[in-house]
């Protein structure tokens, strides 16, 4: 899967408007890769990304009739809810950022340096980013 992230001509309004003025220049990508341990239910998921000198912007559109949104706090385990994930690797072989967003706006952000799965399901080595880090 290949996706080209466009430079934002204007800062997107952060109002969740899929067809907002800034998003018109962003390519739409359909996400059809699901984790093997997930259920057989696969909702329709699309995303758009933009960037500028300081920020990566993203918006997801999910069409689903089964939505779970229980977790509401920062760094909550939103993977137990209906959620989407976004990964960014700033430098090859130096770790990656893992962003997980729930249907109600709660999110989890980790910087993963060793993705080896432990028996708990967690990655072997990661740092939870604070709200101040963002």
Task: Mark where each language-model region is.
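Structural preference for beta-rich elements and adjacent junctions enriched in aromatics
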Residues: 1-134
């Amino acid at each position: 899967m290949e996706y080209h992230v466009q430079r934002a001509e204007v800062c997107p309004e952060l109002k969740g408007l899929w067809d907002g003025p800034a998003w018109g220049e962003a390519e739409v990508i359909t996400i059809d890769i699901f984790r093997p341990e997930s259920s057989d239910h696969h909702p329709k998921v699309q995303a758009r990304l933009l960037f500028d000198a300081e920020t990566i912007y993203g918006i997801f559109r999910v069409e689903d009739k089964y939505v779970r949104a229980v977790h509401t706090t920062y760094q909550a385990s939103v993977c137990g809810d209906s959620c989407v994930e976004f990964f960014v690797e700033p430098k090859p072989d130096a770790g990656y950022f893992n962003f997980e967003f729930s249907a109600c706006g709660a999110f989890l952000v980790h910087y993963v340096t060793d993705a080896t799965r432990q028996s708990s399901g967690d990655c072997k080595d990661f740092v939870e980013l604070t709200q101040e880090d963002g």
